[in-house]
C-alpha cells in the first residue's frame, strides 16, 4: 500500500532540494533517515521530517509495519516564486527571485 506526504512552499530552491532527494530515492526508510542525518545540506532537515511524517501516516492511519517501508517515490516541484528588487546604480533595479519548493514523498511496503 502506498502512503503519501506533502510539504508545500518550503523556502529553498528546488534545484538544491533535488540534490538531497536524489540520495534517498528507492531506499528503505531507516537507511534514508541515516543518510539524511549525515548529509550536510540545509534541505536535509525538512526532507527528513517529511519522510518521518509519511512513515507516521503509514503506521497510524493504515496500520503498516514501519520496518518494511521504503521510499517508492520522492519528487520536488517548483512552488510560487517571491520577487524582490535590489537597487542598483543610476536608478536601476535588479530582480531577485526567491524560489520555493513543493516536496512529495510516497512510501510503500511493496504490496498492493
From Swiss-Prot:
GO biological process, one term: translation
A Pfam family: Ribosomal_L22
GO molecular function: rRNA binding; structural constituent of ribosome
One annotated Gene Ontology cellular component of this protein: cytosolic large ribosomal subunit
CDD domains: Ribosomal_L22 (cd00336)
SUPFAM superfamilies cross-referenced by the UniProt entry: Ribosomal protein L22 (SSF54843)
Annotated keywords: Ribonucleoprotein, Ribosomal protein, RNA-binding, rRNA-binding
PROSITE patterns the record matches: RIBOSOMAL_L22
Subunit-level organization: Part of the 50S ribosomal subunit.
Entries under NCBIfam families matching the protein: rplV_bact
Assigned protein family: Belongs to the universal ribosomal protein uL22 family.
Function: This protein binds specifically to 23S rRNA; its binding is stimulated by other ribosomal proteins, e.g. L4, L17, and L20. It is important during the early stages of 50S assembly. It makes multiple contacts with different domains of the 23S rRNA in the assembled 50S subunit and ribosome.
Descriptive protein name: Large ribosomal subunit protein uL22
Organism: Spiroplasma kunkelii
Gene this chain is encoded by: rplV
Amino acid at each position: 500500500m502506498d502512503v503519501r506526504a506533502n510539504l508545500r512552499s518550503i523556502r529553498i530552491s528546488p534545484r538544491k532540494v533535488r540534490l538531497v532527494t536524489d540520495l534517498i530515492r528507492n531506499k528503505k526508510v531507516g537507511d534514508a533517515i541515516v543518510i539524511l542525518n549525515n548529509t550536510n545540506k540545509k534541505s536535509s532537515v525538512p526532507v527528513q521530517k517529511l519522510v518521518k511524517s509519511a512513515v507516521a501516516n503509514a503506521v497510524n492511519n493504515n496500520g503498516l509495519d514501519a520496518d518494511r517501508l521504503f521510499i517508492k517515490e520522492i519528487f520536488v516541484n517548483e512552488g510560487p516564486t517571491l520577487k524582490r528588487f535590489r537597487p542598483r546604480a543610476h536608478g536601476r533595479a535588479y530582480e531577485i527571485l526567491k524560489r520555493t519548493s513543493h516536496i512529495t514523498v510516497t512510501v510503500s511496503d511493496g504490496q498492493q
